[in-house]
Regions:
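Membrane-cytosol interface segments of multi-pass membrane proteins
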Residues: 1-156, 192, 198, 257, ...
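Short, solvent-exposed loop/turn elements at domain surfaces
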Residues: 32-33, 163, 272
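Alpha-helical transmembrane segments of multi-pass integral membrane proteins
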Residues: 49, 89, 171, 175, ...
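Internal transmembrane alpha-helix with an interfacial aromatic "cap," most often the third helix
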Residues: 56, 121-126, 174-185
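Short glycine/serine- and small hydrophobic-enriched flexible loop segments
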Residues: 57, 61, 130, 175, ...
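Residue-level hotspots within the lipid-embedded alpha helices of multi-pass solute transporters
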Residues: 115-119, 163-167, 227-228, 286
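Alpha-helical membrane segments in multi-pass integral membrane proteins
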Residues: 143-150, 166-169, 228-234
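Hydrophobic, aromatic-enriched interface-forming segments
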Residues: 152-178
Length: 315
């Protein structure tokens, strides 16, 4: 049997899964509802942070090329793996808006897909900025300014320093974080040094995760708490997680399935408005819909691979 190989980080994929569960939970699609785990946008902040972290390295080869190729890469690299389920989700939201009255609580033009659209717009803007500004340190200064502005909007009276401002800031934090060298201990005994490095990174990951979960679980809402989570603890989680070589098929599955937990919330809007009008009652529908979208995506990707293999054989 061939050895399973993956470039994905298992701990990041695990947190993707937990954050997708968190989003569905706060949208009310769980049998048990609680007023704890405040800050429904925090998991989306984490998604933005991770996207920014991996963005700089992936976009480098397009900095000197065509603008349209770069923007195409920004869009296609984030949708190619699940394009058919994304089309299904977008179509269901569009149909829901046509059939039922607009309700800002659940049913607005993009609904739960706003994250994908915002990510595409923000990353495209950052890509254009990278093409104009050739010196990395100037780009980093601009990222620092964006972070300060986006995480200080509450000072201007904007409630909860709105989502649209937090997204660019979290992407900027991710891009700056990706440039920080990894912690590596140097000793004469290389194996011992590697083990010590992994141990220190693991401790950092556990502490960052534990503090973030503790602060999130507190029922009170405080600006300082969200700033601490967004600027220190979430970056700490990503930094230490990407320094630990945890990989495996199980973690990749969780990361892949997290996308469909997120997307599945769109098709069940139709069922919600037509029948139940109760988000808790949609829990089982959400589970079934996520599994169906996951199966469709696996089938589509399998067909793509088969076609590619047949073309390679024919050539």
């Amino acid at each position: 049997m061939a050895e399973y190989k993956t470039k994905k980080n298992g701990l990041i994929e695990l947190f993707r899964f937990l954050c997708s569960i968190w989003v569905a939970y706060f949208h009310g699609f769980f049998l048990i509802h609680s007023d704890k785990f405040n800050g429904v946008i925090l998991p989306v902040d984490f998604f933005f942070l991770v996207s920014g972290f991996f963005f700089l390295k992936s976009i480098q080869k397009y900095r000197d090329g065509s603008v349209w190729k770069g923007i195409g890469f920004v869009f296609w690299s984030r949708t190619n793996r699940f394009i058919v389920p994304l089309i299904i989700a977008a179509s269901s939201v569009l149909l829901c808006n046509i059939i039922f009255p607009l309700d800002l609580g659940f049913n607005w033009p993009l609904s739960f897909l706003w994250f994908f659209a915002a990510q595409f717009v923000y990353l495209s803007c950052y890509f254009l900025l990278l093409k104009v500004i050739k010196k990395q340190f100037i780009f980093n200064i601009i990222c620092g300014v964006v972070i300060c502005i986006s995480l200080s909007m509450f000072l201007l009276g904007i409630k909860n320093f709105d989502i649209c401002f937090r997204g660019p800031g979290m992407l900027a934090i991710g891009m700056l974080l990706s440039q920080i060298p990894k912690l590596k201990i140097k000793l004469k005994n290389e194996k011992k040094a590697n083990r010590l490095s992994i141990a220190i990174n693991a401790i950092g990951f556990v502490i960052s995760s534990a503090l973030a979960i503790y602060l999130i679980y507190l029922p009170d809402y405080a600006i300082w708490k969200i700033q601490l989570i967004c600027c220190i603890l979430f970056p700490g989680i990503v930094y230490f997680a990407t320094s630990i070589p945890v990989r495996g098929r199980f973690f990749d599955f969780l990361g892949e399935f997290s996308v469909f937990i997120y997307l599945a919330q769109c098709p069940i809007l139709l069922h919600y408005y037509a029948f139940t009008k109760d988000t808790k009652a949609e829990f089982y529908t959400l589970c079934v819909c996520a599994v169906v979208l996951f199966g469709i995506n696996r089938l589509v990707n399998y067909i793509k691979k088969r076609k590619k293999a047949l073309k390679a054989q024919a050539a």
